Amino acid sequence: MDADKSPIDYEDFFATLAQNVGPEHVITDKTALSPYGKDIYYESKPPIAVVRPGTIKEVCSTVQTITAAGLCLSARGGGLSYSAGYLTDRQDCVTLDMQRLNEIIEINQDDMYVRVQAGVTWNQLNDALEPLGLRTPFWGTGSGLFATVGGGISQNAINY
């Protein structure tokens, strides 16, 4: 946070996040936040909140709320990273958990591409492609079929 900004009213901030995505999709309880400060191998500081958007509109409004407050933002796929991919050492970070964004938007058999949301798992994608006699040229990340496509693509992208 910049020195010239006034302190954040976290109660209002969390209420705005809840308006963006629904209160059931905002986690602020310290015990519930603890797993979001860890991956399979590393441990860091837990975020101050986890937000689970379910639509692109919810992602946009949530990102706007977080950036307007001057806080750190980290995106998380399935939480199966083993290289600190979504972890941060900052005290003021909000994590976007992308698992609710799990729609396969398009499978284009002619041009051989798919369009998926970030929370689609490699297993989910494989299951959708298999009846068509198709598959991806790889099976996802080393953390397995239940890792998300968005998480796999974003691997090592923190701070970029």
Descriptions of predicted regions:
Residues 1-40, 65-73, 78:
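N-terminal accessory segments
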Residues 10-14, 122, 146:
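Alpha-helix initiation and N-capping motif
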Residues 14-22, 80-86, 129-133:
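Short, mixed-charge, low-aromatic patches
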Residues 17, 41-73, 98-140, 155-160:
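N-terminal glycine-rich flavin-associated loop
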Residues 34-35, 58, 81-84, 122-124, ...:
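Flexible loop/turn segments at secondary-structure boundaries
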Residues 41-42, 88-92, 152-154:
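Short low-complexity, flexible loop/linker segments enriched in glycine and/or proline
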Residues 52, 83-102:
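Structural signature of FAD isoalloxazine-binding scaffolds in flavoprotein oxidoreductases
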Residues 79-81, 142-155:
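Conserved A3 ("GATE") glycine/threonine-rich loop of ANL adenylate-forming enzymes
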